[in-house]
Amino acid sequence: MNNSLSIWTKLHHQAVELAQAEPMLSSHYHQHIINHDDFASALACHLAAQLGGESVSSLALERLFLSILGEQPNIIESALQDMEAYYQRDPACDNYCRPFLFFKGFLAIQSQRLAHALWHRERHSLARYIQHKVSLLCCCDIHPAAQLGSGLMVDHATGLVIGETAEVGNNVSLLHGVTLGGSGNDVGKRHPTIGDDVMISAGAKVLGNITVGKGSKVGAGSVVLNAVPAHVTVAGVPAKIVGRLSDKTPSLSIDQDISH
């Protein structure tokens, strides 16, 4: 909890500084961060502003999101861990405001977390609406039923696809163009399970009801059709094991070199 408060305090402080440094964005920083008393309020406001429109009120969405966050504080904690993941792993992220306001991967993941909550409340149409809006805004498609862990970094996000029965563990890094897809029209569990600390590089496709083991790395452009053990690197089409990792958390280093 103390760390969560610390991240919110830093986010708020940085927003004040950035608003002073760039007056044209001052209202933007105030509306989405500075005017709020806590992270949940800021997050609900920011997401609702992006996802609302002529037919769906942003204010109504904001109230709904606040209600969900109040009932499921784990979503708030996951969002904070995601923001920390960007700050620690992405060299282009030099403050917390960057992912919160400007990184579409962060927007897509937090929107899916709320859509996931709605999905489990049998509000499937609204969850699908959020999925649709995120697809239009962020050029990625994440099913509301997909299960996502915490501490996720989705870099760039363009072209990302995560299917309905996919499961993604904690502290995972996904780069642009990644697909966690099915391998046919089977019903039931048909998408991959991604273990903790996994890094999946740009353009990689992981297909079917298979598991990518903890702390593994998938090389860029690979097509993974079979289960991957823990702590290995796989690459190629179809992907094969090309090495064993001494780095147990490749998702943190974001090293796409498959030779080590």
Give the label of every model feature segment.
Residues 1-133, 252-260:
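Terminal amphipathic alpha-helical/low-complexity segments used for targeting or macromolecular assembly
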Residues 114, 123, 171-181, 196-197, ...:
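A signal for specific C-terminal beta-sheet/loop modules enriched in small/flexible residues
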Residues 135-242:
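Structural signal for interior beta-strand "rungs" in well-ordered beta-sheet cores
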Residues 230, 239-258:
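Acidic, carboxylate-rich catalytic segments that either coordinate divalent cations
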